[in-house]
């Protein structure tokens, strides 16, 4: 049943109750049957299960298999050899796997607290009519059919149809987005279509809202999960968190590397066995040959997989989190950092996000502004809080009292000068309220404020230069024109009139007193935009990001705000929730780009809008602060909650929280997100080019019949030499055009924008340098400086070649990290130095030198001692990677410029 369309009698019949409520026995029976008035709690995933899930990634599985094979080979060798080998490869690989798993669990951000926060919003106790008496019970014990008593300050404990009310206003901003409390009624709502937006159901009270004025009674028609709040809770539990663009790309990369590793390992294994069969070693010694071939395959697996990649990405994202926290953006989910960088659509709630969620007088009409402000202030029930320096009470009346304060008319002082001695309360039929005041001389003065059309027709005079002048048709038209001009700007307009009374009376009535009044003036109010939002939206557009307003407020207000901010240029770009309901999902998916303002929407509309943008391939962010924003925030690629005005529900499902509730902070966060994504790409390109060079080196060496690296060499380079520079690339400052580029396409793979080509050619260049260094060591230096040592059996020519290759590859990758400071520009044009990278380079060089120079480390890694000249050769070969890459980047820039290609952020 749509209770808002039914009479009170029909609602009572449907609830099997009456306006006198239930008996205690009836309530108990229903409680046992229907359950508590609570929201269902979602299932929480055990932490051990989350930990185990970290091990099912393809790259992780390959590392585990490599560790197992390496362990088996070590055990077999130790069983048949007098010299026992320490299983360092196994320990190092498994340590990397476990550390990555721990980091993965630690950084995951879950929305498990969302339902708990919804529970907190619900009232703890409520006043209810039981057995004909008003009693206080736990809100969770309320049932359908209970009649609840609502007064100012009460939280509404369940969804209920109002059956009695006296000037009752309910704050529903968190649920509907409506910034002004809703004046409630008992009357049936007339809706021929049968559909009424949540914010327009004025004879209903909803769980999670708050009574701010007046009093009333209501019969409960929905409890627990059968409330509007329950629908939101259900939407939260059903909303699935998809992978972010970076997670998708790393997952794709993982699969590519997995297939690549398996394919190359099979080829290498087959080639090695064929070679062994050809040279006869397979027949002579089958087991050792096969084991040695396995070892080569393990080396290849270790070389192909960038073990430090997951850790580097996590730490670089963490650096971004720290930087954003300094700019008032708290990241609850690491991957949100990079998602911000590719955001194409920002769906923003209006109330409290684009606006201040504070009604403010912004315009007035009348000859005496001070009298106008004072009359409005005194004819209200809001009070002025001296400590806070602002009014407290119903938002509209607070705006009037604050307006008077700005005119230096403090209500606390004025109400002592003009003491209230009588009133006629506001009601929805009259659309006005009246207060009567007495001055020190005993003179009585009446103020009446309300809807302009109602006030004007009761005025026979108007105030002009301090004098009361008889109202004329022309003056009335002038006032109505002023009213229309304000209303057309989506201002909420109130009028006020005064009347001098002969003496104070014991009773005041509409019929006798709200007539023959003197018109004083009009005020126009609105929830004003935040001053910093307009520049922020301009910045968004410059960065290629489209802002979209989604609000529960009225269409006229939404359009006015949106046009003021530059979100839309024409009212046709706005649509209401009711209009949206008439559009099929298929048609809406095709037309979603036509609209940038959605007014009078309900929670399910917000989720539908977000999903429509995402279905078209746009990376979508959703900002908001109310409970009604939570499902759409969770469904968006990135959810942005408000730290000050935001509800706990919204904060708990958001990926990012703005501690200053400042829309402009999003722009800063987008810039940081783009910087971080740039830097992650730099780190990934650096690591993959390095790993490719290792794979190619082993592949070429295997085909040529020599061993260039052992697993320990590759693990050292991947985990020690490469990790520090990769991390410091994450500290790189933003490039100058980072906020001038269009957002990148989320469908672009990890190798888009020439990254695949760059990794390939850079990997090949480093491979050529490494192979050249090996042959210089094994074929040239072995016959010169090391002939005696080799003859004495201290090490072999192959070991010398491996040592030169190890040193050269390590240093080449360190120097190559400097190439990665800009993926496309010249590093010699970067003005700001990255001191972190310099420090990482020096540290990596020192650690690599220690491995070669310290005897016990050199023995463990099976490296030969090198002299100064050989270091010079290795450095010369390694540093050549910088000019070679600079030349290729210069050629690529020239080609892009000629073809007019613009790179995305």
Language-model-detected regions and their locations in the chain:
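Conserved cytosolic headpiece of P-type ATPases
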Residues: 1-743, 748-751, 764, 806, ...
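Alpha-helical transmembrane segments of multi-pass integral membrane proteins
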Residues: 79, 758-773
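Short N-terminal signal/transit or membrane-insertion segments
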Residues: 150-151, 781, 810
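Helix-coil boundary and interhelical linker segments in multi-pass alpha-helical membrane proteins
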Residues: 702-710, 776-800
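Generic alpha-helical transmembrane segments
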Residues: 721, 800-817
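Membrane-water interface at loop-to-transmembrane-helix junctions
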Residues: 746-764, 794-804
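A C-terminal functional module that forms or caps the active site or interfaces directly
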Residues: 820
């Amino acid at each position: 049943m749509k209770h808002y369309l039914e009479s009170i009698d029909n609602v009572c019949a449907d609830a099997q109750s009456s306006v006198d409520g239930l008996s205690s026995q009836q309530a108990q029976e229903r409680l046992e049957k229907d359950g508590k008035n609570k929201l269902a709690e979602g299932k929480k995933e055990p932490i051990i299960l989350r930990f185990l899930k970290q091990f099912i990634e393809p790259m992780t599985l390959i590392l585990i298999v490599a560790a197992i094979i390496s362990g088996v080979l070590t055990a077999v060798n130790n069983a048949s050899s007098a010299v026992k080998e320490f299983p360092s490869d196994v320990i190092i690989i498994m340590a990397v796997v476990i550390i990555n798993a721990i980091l993965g669990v630690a950084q995951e951000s879950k929305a498990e607290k969302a339902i708990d926060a919804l529970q907190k919003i619900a009232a703890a106790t409520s006043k209810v009519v039981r057995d004909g008496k008003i009693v206080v019970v736990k809100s969770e014990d309320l049932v359908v059919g209970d009649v609840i008593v609502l007064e100012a300050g009460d939280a509404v404990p369940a969804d209920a149809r109002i059956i009695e009310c006296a000037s009752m206003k309910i704050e529903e901003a968190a649920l509907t987005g409506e910034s002004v409390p809703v004046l409630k009624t008992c009357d049936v709502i007339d809706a021929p279509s049968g559909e009424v937006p949540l914010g327009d159901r004025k004879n209903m009270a909803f769980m999670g809202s708050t009574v701010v004025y007046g009093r009333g009674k209501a019969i409960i028609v929905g409890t627990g999960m059968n409330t509007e709040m329950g629908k939101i809770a259900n939407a939260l539990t059903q909303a699935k968190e998809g992978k972010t663009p970076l997670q998708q790309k790393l997952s794709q990369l993982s699969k590519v590397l997995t297939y690549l590793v398996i394919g190359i390992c099979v080829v290498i294994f087959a080639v090695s066995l064929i070679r062994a069969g050809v040279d006869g070693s397979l027949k002579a010694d089958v087991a050792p040959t096969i084991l040695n071939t396995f070892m080569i395959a393990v080396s290849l697996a270790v070389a192909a997989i960038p073990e430090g990649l997951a850790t580097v990405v996590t730490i670089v994202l963490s650096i971004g989190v720290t930087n954003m926290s300094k700019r008032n953006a708290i990241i609850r989910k690491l991957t949100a950092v990079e998602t911000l960088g590719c955001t194409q659509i920002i769906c923003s709630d209006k109330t409290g996000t684009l606006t201040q969620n504070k009604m403010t007088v912004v315009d007035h009409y009348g000859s005496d502004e001070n009298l106008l402000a004072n009359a409005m202030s005194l004819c209200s029930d809001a009070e002025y809080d001296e400590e806070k320096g602002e009014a407290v009470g119903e938002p509209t009346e607070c705006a009037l009292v604050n307006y008077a304060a700005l005119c230096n008319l403090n209500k606390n002082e004025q109400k002592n000068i003009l003491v209230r001695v009588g009133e006629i309360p506001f009601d929805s039929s009259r659309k006005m309220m009246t207060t009567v005041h007495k001055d020190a001389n005993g003179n009585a003065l009446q103020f009446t404020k309300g809807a302009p059309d109602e006030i004007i027709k009761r005025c026979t005079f108007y105030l002009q230069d301090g004098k009361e002048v008889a109202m004329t048709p022309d003056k009335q038209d002038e006032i109505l024109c002023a009213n229309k001009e304000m209303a057309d700007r989506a201002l909420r307009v109130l009028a006020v009139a005064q009347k001098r009374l002969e003496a104070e009376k014991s009773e005041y009535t509409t019929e006798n007193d709200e007539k023959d009044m003197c018109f004083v003036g009009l005020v126009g109010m609105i929830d004003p935009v935040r001053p910093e939002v307009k520049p922020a939206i301009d910045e968004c557009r410059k960065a290629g990001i489209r802002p979209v307003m989604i609000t529960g407020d009225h269409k006229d207000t939404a359009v006015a705000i949106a046009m003021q901010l530059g979100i839309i240029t024409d009212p046709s770009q706005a649509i209401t929730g009711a209009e949206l309901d008439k559009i099929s999902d298929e048609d809406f998916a095709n037309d979603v780009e036509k609209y940038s303002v959605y007014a009078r929407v309900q929670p399910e509309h917000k989720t539908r809008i977000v999903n429509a943008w995402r279905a078209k391939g746009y990376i979508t962010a959703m900002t908001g602060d109310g409970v009604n924003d939570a499902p759409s925030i969770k469904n968006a690629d990135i959810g942005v909650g408000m730290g000050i005005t935001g509800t706990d529900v919204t904060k708990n499902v958001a990926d990012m929280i703005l501690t200053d509730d400042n829309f402009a902070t999003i722009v800063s966060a987008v810039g940081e997100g783009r910087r971080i994504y740039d830097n992650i790409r730099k780190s990934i390109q650096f690591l993959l080019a390095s790993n490719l060079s290792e794979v190619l080196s082993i592949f070429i060496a295997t085909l040529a019949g020599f061993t260039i690296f052992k697993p320990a060499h590759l693990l050292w380079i991947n985990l020690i030499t490469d990790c520090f520079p990769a991390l410091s690339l994450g500290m790189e400052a933003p490039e100058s055009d980072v906020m001038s580029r269009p957002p990148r396409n989320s469908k672009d793979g990890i190798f888009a924008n020439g990254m695949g080509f760059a990794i390939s050619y850079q990997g090949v260049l480093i491979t050529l340098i490494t192979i050249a260094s090996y042959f210089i060591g094994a074929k040239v230096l072995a016959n010169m400086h090391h002939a005696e040592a080799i003859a004495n059996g201290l090490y072999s020519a192959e070991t010398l070649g491996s040592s030169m290759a190890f040193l050269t590859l390590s240093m080449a990758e360190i120097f190559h990290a400097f190439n990665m400071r800009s993926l496309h520009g010249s590093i010699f044009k970067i003005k700001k130095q990255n001191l972190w990278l310099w420090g990482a380079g020096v540290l990596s060089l020192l650690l690599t030198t220690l491995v070669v120079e310290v005897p016990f480390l050199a023995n463990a890694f099976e490296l030969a001692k090198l002299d100064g000249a050989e270091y010079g050769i290795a450095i010369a070969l390694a540093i050549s990677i910088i000019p070679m890459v600079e030349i290729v980047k210069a050629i690529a820039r020239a080609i892009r410029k000629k073809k007019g290609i613009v790179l995305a952020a």
